[in-house]
Each structure stands twice: as C-alpha cells, then as structure tokens.
C-alpha cells in the first residue's frame, strides 16, 4: 500500500465511526418518537402535559402566560423562527447559495431533506389528528392538528441540516461546535415557545424534536454514503470549505 493511501486510513476510520454514530443517533430519535406516539395515543401523557401547561399560566387566569406582557411578545417572535414561511425562506436562500457555489449535490440534499420533512410532518399530523390545547389565544391562527409540533419538527430538520452543512464546511473545531450549538439552540427555543404560548402540548414538542432530529440525521447518513461512493473529482458533497 502506498504512503498516500496509508495517510488516508485514519480519516476513513473516523468517517466510518461518525457514520455509525449518526445511525445510532437516528435510531434513538426514531425510538423516542415511537414511544411518545404510543404514550399519546394511549392517553398516558395527558396529566403531565396539562400540569406543565398550567404551570406556565398565570394563577386564576389560564388564558394568560406566566410573566410580563413583553415575555409573551418575545415568545411570539421566537416562535416565528420555526414558522413554515421563515423556514422556507432559509431553505431557498441556502439552496441558491449552494447552487451558485456549484455544490449541486449539497443543494439537492438540503431541498430533499427539508421538502420530504415538511411532507412527513403533514402526514404525521393527519395520521394522529390530536386536538390542540384549549389555552390557545384567540388571535393565534391554527389550522393543523397538534401532534407532532410542526414548528418543533420543522426547526429540527431545517436548522440541524443547515447547521451540519456549515459545520462540515469548516476545519475549525470551535466553529463547528458553535454552528451546531446555534442550530440546537434555535430548535430548542422554538419548541419551548410553542409550549409557553399554549398552542402545543409538551409531548407534541418532544415528538417534533425527535422526529425532526431523526429526519435530519438520516439524510446526513445518506449523504455520507453518497460521498463515499462518489468517484474521485466528482461534484460530491463538500468535505471542507464552501465556495
């Protein structure tokens, strides 16, 4: 074996370990979603769901979220970061950038992962058709079922997909951790805002996070396979820098 091939072996082993870790993470997220779904269908989460929601409401006035008025407005601003409109604009902007940078497969990955994720979210909501909490403010428009939370699931598969792409484009470990941390934080605060506003049961949000994480990780595991099988010099998914 030539020296160049020997030098590549540690990196290949690391990529294989990372692939196995992603498969395990995806399987864990899927398992968590299935367990939550079964508990919701059987009514096992209702008592805890209601207790958490009521703990976040003003005593004697369940229509009013806990805290100052500005807190509710802040939660509405945060929850907008997980809205279909905002997430769609982010996906379009990222995809156009990747296409202009000639990273066509990366653009295809983003579009496929997020587009199929949006479809999966819709199908899951139709399948479970869980009623929303009765605490929803009258001025918040709701048109879909409660389980799983679309904002939580959409934020997970969009922000985690884009975060993983940006992290992969950097060779700086601290930058990688920062980008992934931002993606996780955005996903987390969007989900929490849905509970605080009373538009979702806590189990809806947990299930949305689990399903969205599974979707994002599963697509990146697929991307690993595509990258590994791509011939040398092909326009595969970027390993280091974008642009």
Question: Which residues are covered by each model-predicted region?
Answer:
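Membrane-interface loops
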Residues: 46, 50-60, 64, 89-173, ...
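Membrane-embedded catalytic cores of phosphoryl/pyrophosphoryl-handling enzymes
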Residues: 133-243
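Arginine residue identity/basic-tract feature
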Residues: 11-13, 18, 57, 69, ...
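Hydrophobic alpha-helical membrane segments, chiefly transmembrane helices and signal peptide h-regions
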Residues: 17-41, 81-99, 108-127, 156-164, ...
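N-terminal transmembrane-helix/juxtamembrane module of multi-pass inner/ER membrane proteins
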Residues: 1-85, 128, 132-139
């Amino acid at each position: 074996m030539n020296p160049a091939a020997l030098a590549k072996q540690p990196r290949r082993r690391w990529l294989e370990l990372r692939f196995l870790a992603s498969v395990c993470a995806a399987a864990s997220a899927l398992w968590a979603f299935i367990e939550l779904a079964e508990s919701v269908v059987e009514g096992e989460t209702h008592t805890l769901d209601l207790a958490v929601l009521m703990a976040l409401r003003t005593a004697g006035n369940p229509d009013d979220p806990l805290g100052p008025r500005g807190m509710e407005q802040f939660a509405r601003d945060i929850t907008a970061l997980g809205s279909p409109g905002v997430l769609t604009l982010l996906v379009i902007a990222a995809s156009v950038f990747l296409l202009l940078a000639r990273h066509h497969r990366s653009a295809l990955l983003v579009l496929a992962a997020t587009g199929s994720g949006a479809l999966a979210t819709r199908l899951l909501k139709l399948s479970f058709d869980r009623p929303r909490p009765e605490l929803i403010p009258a001025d918040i428009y709701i048109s879909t079922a409660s389980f799983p939370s679309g904002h939580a699931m959409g934020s997970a598969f969009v922000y985690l997909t884009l975060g993983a792409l940006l992290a992969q484009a950097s060779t700086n470990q601290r930058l990688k951790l920062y980008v992934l941390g931002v993606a996780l934080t955005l996903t987390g605060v969007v989900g929490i805002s849905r509970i605080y506003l009373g538009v979702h049961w806590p189990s809806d949000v947990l299930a949305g996070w689990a399903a969205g994480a599974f979707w994002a990780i599963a697509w990146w595991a697929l991307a690993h396979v595509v990258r590994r099988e791509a011939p040398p010099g092909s326009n595969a998914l970027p390993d280091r820098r974008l642009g």
